[in-house]
Amino acid sequence: MARIAGVDIPRDKRVVISLTYVFGIGRTTAEKILTEAGISSETRVRDLTEDELGRIRDVIDRIKVEGDLRREVSLNIKRLMEIGSYRGLRHRRGLPVRGQNSKNNARTRKGPRRTVANKKK
């Protein structure tokens, strides 16, 4: 397994697919990385030379990925919560942030149901 940006990427897959195992790199970014490094997207990871791996690493070093990206996202969310914006309040309460309906659904964000017991009449 080749190691790129602290992630072991699978050897038997094509390079484009393997690069998506790194947090912050999707298909489009992977294509751009390979174009910039001058490597065919059809190549398998096991067929890459050390020189090609080095070129891929150099290109990825200029992009925010893995820990740096996770840290930036969490700091952005923390900032929203501190300034008291609507989005920050939704994050703090564990509710959907992007305007989704939360009357009946949103169970993923709200967690399991907490049932309230009825009073006897």
UniProtKB/Swiss-Prot annotation:
Positions of region (Disordered): 91-121
GO molecular function per UniProt: rRNA binding; structural constituent of ribosome; tRNA binding
GO BP annotation list: translation
Pfam families the record matches: Ribosomal_S13
InterPro entries on file: Rbsml_uS13_C (IPR027437), Ribosomal_uS13 (IPR001892), Ribosomal_uS13-like_H2TH (IPR010979), Ribosomal_uS13_bac-type (IPR019980), Ribosomal_uS13_CS (IPR018269)
Keywords of this entry: Ribonucleoprotein, Ribosomal protein, RNA-binding, rRNA-binding, tRNA-binding
GO cellular component: cytosol; small ribosomal subunit
Domain of life: Bacteria
Biased composition regions of type Basic residues, renumbered to the chain: 106-121
PROSITE patterns given in the database record: RIBOSOMAL_S13_1 (PS00646), RIBOSOMAL_S13_2 (PS50159)
Job of this protein: Located at the top of the head of the 30S subunit, it contacts several helices of the 16S rRNA. In the 70S ribosome it contacts the 23S rRNA (bridge B1a) and protein L5 of the 50S subunit (bridge B1b), connecting the 2 subunits; these bridges are implicated in subunit movement. Contacts the tRNAs in the A and P-sites.
Family: Belongs to the universal ribosomal protein uS13 family.
Quaternary assembly: Part of the 30S ribosomal subunit. Forms a loose heterodimer with protein S19. Forms two bridges to the 50S subunit in the 70S ribosome.
PANTHER family associated with the record: 30S RIBOSOMAL PROTEIN S13/40S RIBOSOMAL PROTEIN S18 (PTHR10871), SMALL RIBOSOMAL SUBUNIT PROTEIN US13M (PTHR10871:SF1)
Protein name, entry field: Small ribosomal subunit protein uS13
